[in-house]
Amino acid sequence: MTVSPENPVYNGGQQIPSVAVQVGDTILKENDQYQLSYAQMVGGAAATFDPATDTTALVNAGTYYLYITGQNGYSGKIQKEYVIAQKDISDAAVEVTLQDNIDWDKVLADAAADPDNASATLTSCIKEVKDTARTDADAVDGVKNLVEGTDYTISLSKTGRGITLTGTGNYTGERY
């Protein structure tokens, strides 16, 4: 069994894999010689879904399972993992725009002086964070604004002289 793409990265859109099943020299036909089903682990149990009718399936980063079950002269069941990887927040398609006329010395000093409110202080410096390579329906011309707390968190850098965005949810990595 081959599945493509092999290593998709989160892009906001549904990523239904192309599946080819071959036994010897015979390429099997879906719904004739085998059935294809999908599942994802939810709360410790496999939740099945049909990506043709559930447009929210195979969208988010995570591990999914494809099951091939033989029929009409073919028997057995094959399980294949299909992983949609988190997108790295340091990817060039993720753009960070800062507010104009920021007094960085004051902002960084305020954030360092009050660590409990550092995130709010630093957030006020960011105009927007957006992903310019999205394929989901609610992206406008491939661009979607990211949401703090859902797609990234913000903190004072380890040096105390800058900010760090840390990917969360469908995003991973750090951006300084």
Which functions belong to the PLM regions below?
Residues M1-Y176:
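Solvent-exposed beta-strand/loop surfaces, strongest in extracytoplasmic domains of secreted
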